[in-house]
Each structure stands twice: as C-alpha cells, then as structure tokens.
Amino acid sequence: MLAAVAVGAVGLGAVFVDGAPFWGADGGGPPALLPGLAYLVLAILGVRMTWRRGAIIAGVTAGLFLLVAFLDSLRAPDSQSHLGRFFDSMLAGEAMDIIVRKGQQNLSILFGNYKLALLVPVALVFVIYVLARPTSWGSRALQRSFDSAPTLRPGLIALLVTLTIGFLINDSGVAIPANGALIAVPLIITVAVGTLLDEARMTGATRAARRR
C-alpha cells in the first residue's frame, strides 16, 4: 500500500508539473503519463487490469485534460497556453483541424525516414514480446530481475504504455519512445546485471561455506 501511495504521489506530481498551464503546459504529456501511472498503481495494489478499467482510465484522463484546458481558457488570451487555445478551438469547431495537422506532422516524421517507420513498430512489438515472455531471446536475467523486484515488470509495462501513447498523440511522436529508450535501456541493463552479480555473490558464498 505504501509503495502505491509513493508511486501515485510522485507520478501525480510529475503530471501536474508537466501539464499545469503556468509550468509545463504540455498537452500531450499528461494524457500519456496518467494511463501508465494508473496501471502501475493498480498493479502494485494487485488489481488486475481489464478492458472496463482501461476504458475508465481513458475517460478520466480525457476528462482531466478537458478540465485543465477549460480552466486555462478562462484566463486572459495573452496568458493562455496552447491548452486554453485548444479548448477555444473546440468551441469554434476548429479542433479537428489541429488534430489532423499534428497527426500529419507525426506521420511525416515517421514515414519521412523509412528506417524509422520500420524500426518503431518492430521495436514496440519486440518489447511487448519480451515482457510477455521474459525468458526468451536470452533475457533470463530480466526474468530473474522480475523475481527479485516484483514491481519491475509492472513498471516496464507502465513505461511502455506511456511511451506508446506519447508516440501516437504527439506531433514529435517518434522522438518520444526514442528518448524514453535512451533513459530506460541503460537502467534496465544495470538492474539485470546487478541481479546476476548478486546471484553470483550468493552462489560463491554458498560454495565457500560448503568447503569449510
């Protein structure tokens, strides 16, 4: 319970800083962060994710986004962030134009380089496969890490959820999973290697004790 509270507090703080109009004013960050955070908190509490719970999380995320955008739209035009301006565009019937333009920007970045166009979906599918079957593809060290740190696997799944949503809804889409991987992959390798080293030390200590 304490772990879930700690994760929720840190995560909500990050969402607030990222999405608050007077700070980050990021329209694409909170909708990507909240579902991953919700999944992680539920997983720590032992609550199984279902389609219904996923739909509720999506609805709450969309509602909070619209609420923040609405509150920002109440400020003076010169003080509004793009969240408030987006809400005003919804009232004016121009929101779809913005969504289409951002989608086109994302697609142009993705398909402007065919290597990236192939790499991103393949990489996401590979990560999903490894998380589903962590003993495959030589990743037994990852399974051992999952065994020694029960929150590691839910954390990686939450990260995957956040990066995937961020990839889909941001106009800089392909940069989201790329930057996330730059941070996550070295940390994952460090955890896996640390687990193997701990096991090696324990094995060595056991053998030394038997020889005495």
Regions found by a protein language model. Name each.
Residues 40-44, 66-70, 125-136, 187-200:
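Alpha-helical transmembrane segments
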Residues 2-3, 46-59:
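Membrane-interfacial entry segments at the cytosolic side of transmembrane helices
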Residues 28, 54-92:
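Aromatic-rich transmembrane-lumenal/periplasmic boundary elements in polytopic membrane proteins
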Residues 18-27, 168-175:
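Membrane-interface helix caps and helix-loop-helix hairpins in membrane proteins
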Residues 1-2, 135-150, 201-212:
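Membrane-interfacial, low-structure loops and terminal tails that flank and connect transmembrane helices
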Residues 91-114:
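Juxtamembrane membrane-water interface segments that cap and precede transmembrane helices
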Residues 6-15, 33-37, 58-65, 93-97, ...:
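Hydrophobic membrane-spanning alpha-helices of multi-pass integral membrane proteins
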Residues 108-135:
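Alpha-helical transmembrane segments at the extracellular/periplasmic loop-to-helix junctions
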